[in-house]
Amino acid sequence: MLQLLLSVERPVTVLGAGLAGTEAAWQVARAGIPVTIVEMRPMRRSPAHHSSDFAELVCSNSFGALSSDRAAGLLQEEMRRLGSLVIETADAHAVPAGGALAVDRGRYSAALTEALDQHPLVTIERREQQALPGDDQITVLATGPLTSEPLAEDLRAFTGRSDCHFFDAASPIVHGDSIDLNVAFRASRYDKGDADYINCPMDKEQYLAFREALLTAEQAELKDFDKNDATFFEGCLPIEELARRGEDTMRYGPLKPIGLWDPRWGDVNDRDVRRAKRAYAVVQLRQEDKDGRLWNLVGFQTNLKWGEQKRVLQMIPGLAEAEFVRFGVMHRNTFLESPQLLEPTLQFRSRSSLLAAGQITGTEGYAAAVAGGWLAGTNAARLARGLAPIDLPATCMSGALTHFVSEAPTAKFQPMPPNFGLLPELPERIRDKRARYGAYRDRALRDLERIKALTPNALVA
């Protein structure tokens, strides 16, 4: 019976094998539909990728908070319940990160690549796609914010609109054994969970000198943009941009010292000791791999020249002899003016057989890309079967994001990460924030249950 169905169903093409494309392709194959993944790497590299593996994490190695009463954690939990391969694999390759889901990015991407490569319904074509397929082909556009120029040009012609853009950056990574733990210390903020972070404390004099070095360091030249009109994503600002915004901006952002204490300083419960010893600012490093040999500087996205990165970052206490595995880089991210173009099903309004997913739609963050891939892949499979596409409830974090990108005001559409402000108000006002977020979570997961009957598994039952 399955062979008969496959003979009359339309195959699906997924353009791009990032987080969204990987998830979309898996959901199509999971439904019993043949799917072709077109990925330009390694034939053509992007400015930010370092390998040809699928779902390469080019910025942080963290998917955000694990707890489901946090926006990113709720989105992860929704994807787990909907059978996301990408989140399931992240759980399997997690590294210690306090209350966050962080992964060994090399093993993680390799595992996802292998899973798709070995699936009998998946065909992988390593080539650059330079134009959109015809409207007779069911296609998921998941080429991400680094879509190659020929395809981007064809997409502009198809939509009749110029794409939007912002500039994104990745943090440096250092060898763990080059960090001086006589100066730095292991701890998680407020001692939550295990001591999963390495913390480099600064006094006021060190902090001010470090900020001055950031302000005067030479930056790498970015191509194809007006330096006076550079647009950054507020959730991923370069550290030098934070330094420019004010003397204390970094201390209230990635360098905030609150909740971090080195036991060598004395008794944290002694008020006098705490006042005398507490750090003025703290740089945190998060484990990058399973073995704890590589560590990334949290919140240290940067566009400084590589030599300048080494000079300035080695001013951080504990990193004077740091050996850099990777320096930070910046790149231009392209996204669609989705509210003018997409339905909540992630189909293009002008071509129902073409769907979009991931960062190119204007969602921000790894978990959001996975959610878009899940929905686009599920709907591509349904279209291949001749079934109506679905959208996700706006009360779920995944649904709130897709409704935002398809329905937001378009005067100045900008990328949006998962956040509770996207969800409809609760019937009753709850003043306590944690209790309110818990109520949002409970409603979201309850409403998600009705969608589970429509996922690809049900299509082949």
From Swiss-Prot:
GO terms for molecular function: flavin adenine dinucleotide binding; tRNA (uracil(54)-C5)-methyltransferase activity, 5,10-methylenetetrahydrofolate-dependent. It comes from the Bacteria. GO terms for cellular component: cytosol. The keyword Zinc does not apply. FAD binds at G16, A17, G18, L19, A20, G21. Its cofactor is FAD. GO terms for biological process: tRNA methylation; tRNA wobble uridine modification. Its EC number is 2.1.1.74. InterPro entries: FAD/NAD-bd_sf (IPR036188), MnmG-rel (IPR002218), MnmG_N (IPR040131), TrmFO (IPR004417). It catalyses: uridine(54) in tRNA + (6R)-5,10-methylene-5,6,7,8-tetrahydrofolate + NADH + H(+) = 5-methyluridine(54) in tRNA + (6S)-5,6,7,8-tetrahydrofolate + NAD(+); uridine(54) in tRNA + (6R)-5,10-methylene-5,6,7,8-tetrahydrofolate + NADPH + H(+) = 5-methyluridine(54) in tRNA + (6S)-5,6,7,8-tetrahydrofolate + NADP(+). Its main location: cytoplasm. Keywords: Cytoplasm, FAD, Flavoprotein, Methyltransferase, NAD, NADP, Transferase, tRNA processing. Belongs to the MnmG family. TrmFO subfamily. PANTHER family: GLUCOSE INHIBITED DIVISION PROTEIN A, METHYLENETETRAHYDROFOLATE--TRNA-(URACIL-5-)-METHYLTRANSFERASE TRMFO. This is Methylenetetrahydrofolate--tRNA-(uracil-5-)-methyltransferase TrmFO. It comes from Parasynechococcus marenigrum (strain WH8102).
